[in-house]
Every structure is written in C-alpha cells, then in structure tokens.
C-alpha cells in the first residue's frame, strides 16, 4: 500500500458512511411523512412475494358495473375514480381487479385513476376468464397462449408496463397446470409481472399447480358468515408461506349497513340468484333472516361508535393469516368509512357477542370450500 493510500481510503469510507447516514435519515423522514399521510392504515407482507400491501384492499368488482351476467349494478365512473383517489390518500395501496369485472371496464377505470400515482399502488389482476360473445357466457381458458394474451390486454387497459400480482381467476377444468405455469414464468422473466398466484382454488388444485412452479398468492372468500377456508386452506397457505388475500369482507353487500326489508337486486346483478359462492345466503327467506341478523350486528357496532362495515372489516383483519382483506367500494364516503375498520381491535367479549348474533344467520352450511361450477 502506498503512503497515504490507507488514509485516503479511510477518509473515503468515512465520507461514504456519513453520506449513507444522511441518505438513511432523509429516507426515514420521507417514510414518516408518507405514513402520516396514510393515517391509521396497517400493512403486511404478502406471503413470500416481498410485496408490502395495505391490510385493507380495494375490491374493484362493483366498479365494473353491469356489462354482462355476473356483475353488479350501474356505477358512476367519476365517483369510482374519486373513490380510488381517496383510497390512495388514506393509505390503501392494493387494488384488486380482473378482466371479468365489467368485461375490462374496472381495469380501465383503475388505469385512468392511478395515472402518475401508479408507483404508490399494488395492482392485482387476473386471467383465464373471458366473455364469449357468441355463446353469451363466461368462458374459462388457462392455457399458455390465453394467459399471455390476457396479461397483455390487462397491461393496456391498466395503462402500466407491469402487474404486481397476476392470478388465475378460477380453476380451469380442462386446463394444463404445466402450460399455465410456463406462461407465468415467461411473464415474470420479462418483467411484466412481479408475482403470480390463483383464486378460488382448492388445496388439491394448489398441490397440482405447485408441481410445475411457485404459487405465491391464493385468493379466497372469507367473512363472518363464510368461514369455509378455515378448515383446510388457511393451514395450507400458512404452512407454505403463500400470501392469502380474502374477498367478500362485507359479505357482498350484506354488511354494508344499508340493506333493509325492501332490499332487492336488479336483474343483471349476480346476487339476484340468491347463491353467494356456494352458500344460499340470499336465497328465499334466507335473505330476510340475514338482513335481520345484519341489523343486529349494526346495532352492536353503533353502540361502540362504529359502523357495520367497520365491524366486518375489523373481524377479517384481526386474523394474522390474512395478508389483505378486500372490500368493494364505489364512493369516497365508503372508502373513508371502511379504512377505519382496520384500526378496530375486537375484544374477546365482543367476539363472543358477535358469535351469538351470527348464530341467527341462515344459509351458512356448505362444502369446506367454494366449488366453481
């Protein structure tokens, strides 16, 4: 070592260390400011993806409106965009959509709304389901070509060059796990997708697909009335470090706090058939009984200065195995109300009272998982 070289290196190291500390301190200030802006939102890691997500996720299905069979009622685009912006302001980072939601409409609205705020969001979308105009029905196709084509179309509608999480929407009875996983690998290797997973799968189907690659995320229905995933799916995803997204936190509107004895559904609304993902919660007399039960839960929540949606979200969010719990939202007011739910910690005595009220529900018996027909 030449004379003075050691001193020079030490000096350079000291400067580098000092700059590193300054940079770290600046980043901490930025991070604190960012979190203050987010308010009381909580965040969790989504399994092994390395992606941090808001505990409350924005469910985009209702925003798809009524385009084809299986959608919700009409939704105002401007209100939907305002709701997305408000969610971002309050710290919601995860947005869950799909080509099937309004036949691409929900993706397009999300892409428009995010704009320059795309970097503040985690976009989850899906593939393998499309509308067949000739047959006038939804078709499931999860072969390699279909997945690649669907992803490209989603990227265009979302106005982005990458998707954070891409899920197979529903199991394809005629699909090839090897072909699906090959498509996933191509998309990840190209940088168009960060993480991959599935939705509405059984543990047996997960086993089959995982023989051909890594499944990082599973999405299933889960709420106070639908606890079927607790039997097999929850232990499975926990044991295999698979990120668990739950949908239906508000039981598809039942826990919105707005239903009453006069509640009915439009002809194009999927809930009009009464079946809620394999449970007859809204069928015949069950609907009236469950609305009555929900109103008792509403009274319980209001006696504690909360709303029914906040109670429903708090109940799902309290479970450590949940990476993010989705709730459908179509207005800024709904966003503001729902966000508060993740900050409510339910006491043991409150949980016992909730279970007593839930005992009056109807149509909760079913298989230990939702079977896609």
Q: Which ranges hold each PLM region?
A:
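Conserved, mostly hydrophobic/aromatic
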Residues: 46, 58, 80, 95, ...
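Terminal-tail/helix-coil boundary detector
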Residues: 36-41, 81, 265-303, 318-323, ...
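Active-site beta-loop-alpha junctions enriched in small/polar residues
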Residues: 61-63, 98-100, 126-130, 168-171, ...
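Aromatic-lined glycan-binding groove of carbohydrate-active enzymes
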Residues: 229-272
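Glycine/proline-rich, positively charged
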Residues: 67, 134-228, 232, 242-243
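N-terminal binding-site loop/beta-alpha segment at the start of enzyme catalytic domains
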Residues: 28-121
């Amino acid at each position: 070592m030449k004379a003075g070289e050691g001193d020079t290196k030490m000096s350079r190291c000291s400067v580098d260390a000092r700059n590193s500390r300054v940079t770290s301190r600046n980043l901490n200030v930025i991070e604190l400011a960012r979190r203050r802006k987010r308010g009381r939102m909580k965040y969790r890691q989504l399994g092994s993806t390395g992606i941090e997500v808001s505990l409350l996720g924005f469910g985009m299905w209702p925003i798809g409106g009524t385009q084809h069979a299986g959608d919700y009622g009409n939704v105002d685009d401007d209100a939907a965009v305002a709701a997305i912006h408000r969610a971002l302001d309050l710290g919601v980072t995860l947005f869950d959509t799909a080509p099937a939601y309004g036949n691409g409409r929900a993706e397009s609205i999300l892409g428009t709304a995010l704009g320059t705020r795309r970097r503040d969001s985690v976009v989850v979308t899906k593939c393998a389901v499309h509308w067949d105009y000739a047959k006038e029905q939804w078709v499931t196709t999860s072969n390699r070509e279909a997945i690649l084509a669907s992803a490209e179309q989603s990227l265009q509608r979302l106005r982005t060059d990458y998707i954070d999480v891409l899920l197979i929407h529903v199991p394809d009875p005629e699909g090839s796990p090897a072909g699906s996983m090959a498509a996933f690998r191509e998309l990840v290797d190209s940088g168009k997708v960060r993480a991959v997973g599935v939705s509405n799968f059984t543990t047996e189907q997960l086993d089959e697909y995982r023989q051909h690659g890594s499944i990082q995320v599973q999405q299933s229905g889960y709420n106070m009335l639908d606890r079927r995933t607790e039997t097999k799916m929850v232990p499975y995803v926990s044991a295999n470090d698979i990120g668990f997204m739950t949908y239906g936190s508000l039981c598809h509107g039942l826990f919105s706090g707005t239903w009453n004895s006069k509640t009915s559904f439009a002809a194009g609304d999927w809930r009009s058939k009464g079946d809620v993902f394999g449970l007859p919660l809204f069928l015949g007399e069950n609907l009236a009984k469950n609305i009555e039960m929900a109103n008792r839960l509403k009274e319980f929540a209001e006696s504690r200065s909360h709303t029914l949606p906040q109670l429903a979200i708090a109940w799902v969010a309290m479970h450590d195995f949940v990476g993010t719990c989705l709730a459908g939202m179509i207005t800024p007011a709904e966003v503001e109300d729902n966000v508060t739910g993740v900050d409510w910690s339910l006491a043991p005595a409150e949980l016992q009272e909730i279970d007593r009220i839930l005992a009056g529900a109807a149509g909760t018996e079913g298989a230990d998982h939702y079977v896609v027909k």
